[in-house]
């Protein structure tokens, strides 16, 4: 199945969207890629994925300073490497729009591929103020603070790219769908992909059609992304988020 998809909205009011903040630019240069990644990671340079320490093969790393060298074929994807965390908005058909939290880990093992894992969870609205009226001090203290709700979908897979910068994104969705997306870098700080094939299991999502994703680094070096899906014959917003680098 194939799909079309539109532009992105940033959850951070006042910030440009990834599409707006990553206008066309020169083809990626190795030194530029390293410099951009270094600027992004000044406060997270000493942090990385947990490691086992006794594997006889290279460990996965989300920090370009540790572990094996990044494969030369991945330069166009280099700025994505890291662990990113933040919040976003989801608008699923038949449901009210809700806020979710996300951790997105993008890592490598020295081979010509990136691995990734995404975890999301629902963020419930803050408890109503005045909870102390019920005599619950703990509730009163947490009034106004958002609460972590149910766990949502997980994704895992791989980013691959060839010598002509054609990207393949292979995604396994925890709710019972496998997806292949193709795309290209828009600039050295933005990447756009769209579904080439989706396969749902018998218990997987029957209404979720093919989609299109845009990932982009914003002027503040946050990673923004947006996903739209073909639902009932038209492309509609599905999920979008703005994530800060926390490791790498």
UniProtKB/Swiss-Prot annotation:
Q: Where is this motif: GXWXGXG?
A: 82-88
| Pfam families the UniProt entry points to | THAP4_heme-bd (PF08768)
Spell out the residue ranges making up region: Disordered: 1-49, 118-147
**Which SUPFAM superfamilies is this protein grouped with?**
Lipocalins (SSF50814)
Q: Name the source's superkingdom.
A: Bacteria
Q: Which family does it belong to?
A: Belongs to the nitrobindin family.
UniProt name for this protein: Ferric nitrobindin-like protein
Per the UniProt entry, what species is this protein from, by scientific name?
A: Corynebacterium urealyticum (strain ATCC 43042 / DSM 7109)
């Amino acid at each position: 199945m194939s799909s079309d998809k539109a532009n992105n909205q940033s959850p951070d009011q006042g910030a440009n969207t990834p599409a707006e903040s990553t206008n066309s630019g020169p083809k990626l240069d190795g030194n530029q890629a390293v410099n951009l990644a270094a600027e992004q990671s000044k406060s997270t340079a000493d942090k990385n994925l947990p490691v086992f320490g006794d594997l006889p093969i290279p460990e996965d790393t989300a920090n370009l300073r540790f572990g094996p060298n990044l494969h030369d074929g991945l330069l166009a994807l280099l700025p994505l490497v890291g662990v990113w965390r933040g919040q976003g908005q989801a608008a699923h058909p038949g449901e009210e729009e809700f806020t979710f939290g996300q951790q997105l880990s993008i890592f490598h093992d020295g081979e010509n591929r990136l691995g990734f894992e995404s975890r999301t969870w629902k963020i419930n609205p803050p408890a109503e103020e005045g909870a102390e009226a019920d005599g619950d001090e703990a509730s009163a203290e947490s009034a106004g603070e958002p609460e972590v709700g149910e766990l949502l979908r997980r994704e895992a897979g791989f980013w691959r790219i060839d010598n002509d910068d054609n990207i393949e994104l292979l995604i396994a969705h925890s709710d019972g769908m496998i997806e292949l997306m193709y795309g290209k870098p828009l600039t050295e700080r933005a990447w756009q992909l769209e579904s080439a094939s989706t396969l749902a299991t018998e218990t997987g999502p029957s209404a979720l059609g093919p989609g299109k994703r845009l990932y982009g680094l914003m002027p503040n070096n946050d990673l923004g992304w947006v996903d739209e899906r073909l639902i009932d014959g038209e492309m509609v917003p599905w999920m979008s988020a703005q994530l800060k680098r926390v490791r790498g």
